[in-house]
From Swiss-Prot:
GO molecular function ontology, one term from the record: metal ion binding
Species of the source: Rotavirus A (isolate RVA/Human/Sweden/1076/1983/G2P2A[6])
Domain notes: Binds 1 calcium ion per tetramer.
Name of this protein: Non-structural glycoprotein 4
Membrane topology field: Single-pass type III membrane protein
Family, as annotated: Belongs to the rotavirus NSP4 family.
Pfam families: Rota_NSP4 (PF01452)
Ranges of the Lumenal topological domain: 1-28
HAMAP family the record matches: ROTA_NSP4
Chain segments annotated as transmembrane: 29-51
GO biological process annotation, one example: viral process
Taxonomic lineage of the native organism: Viruses, Riboviria, Orthornavirae, Duplornaviricota, Resentoviricetes
Protein modification: The N-glycosyl content is primarily Man(9)GlcNAc, with a small amount of Man(8)GlcNAc.
Keywords: Activation of host autophagy by virus, Calcium, Enterotoxin, Glycoprotein, Host endoplasmic reticulum, Host membrane, Host-virus interaction, Ion channel, Ion transport, Membrane, Metal-binding, Secreted, Signal-anchor, Toxin, Transmembrane, Transmembrane helix, Transport, Viral ion channel, Virulence
Residues carrying covalently attached carbohydrate according to the record: N8, N18
Length: 175
């Protein structure tokens, strides 16, 4: 029975649209007929599509206000796109989501900057310690015997036979 009621309602709306269009067509100066016909078709389609959708959404949803708001915004955005506008209507929730996303990204960037700054400070401190260790300090006279590892080398007076044992000897070989 509901289907017949919807069918009668649809036929009545179509009849109303046809009579409106015939009234408009009687005016010979009407140049905007295709635009008006398109708008009326879109409005009728939106009307027929949105009412059952809204009924189902309101019955199944716990937060009906958000559903109505979302459907209304979607319908207006569709109409704006059909009219050729690039702008869209945004709800407060979408703006808050975008702001939360921006704030989250800023926090992530700040944490990264803090980590990088901490690393750079640690590197600078390490370089300072390395520089301090590499600084040349004058100690006055340096004992070169220890530097060239000659601690156990004996002087000429300390040799037993008085001659240098490291001097080359004359060697004769038998043939």
């Amino acid at each position: 029975m509901d289907k017949f009621t919807d069918l009668n309602y649809t036929l009545n709306v179509i009849t109303l649209m046809n009579s409106t269009l015939h009234t408009i067509l009687e005016d010979p100066g009407m140049a905007y007929f295709p635009y008006i016909a398109s708008v009326l078709t879109v409005l009728f389609t939106l009307h027929k599509a949105s009412i059952p959708t809204m009924k189902i959404a309101l019955k199944t949803s716990k937060c009906s206000y958000k559903v109505v708001k979302y459907c209304t915004v979607t319908i207006f955005n569709t109409l704006l796109k059909l009219a050729g506008y690039k702008e869209q209507i945004t709800t407060k929730d979408e703006i808050e989501k975008q702001m939360d996303r921006v704030v989250k990204e800023m926090r992530r960037q700040l944490e990264m900057i803090d980590r990088l700054t901490t690393r750079e400070i640690e590197q600078v401190e390490l370089l300072k310690r390395i520089h301090d260790k590499l600084m040349v300090q004058s100690t006055g006279e340096i004992d070169m015997r220890k530097e060239i590892n000659q601690k156990n080398v004996k002087t000429l007076e300390e040799w037993e036979s008085g001659r240098n044992p490291y001097e080359p000897k004359e060697v004769t070989a038998a043939m």
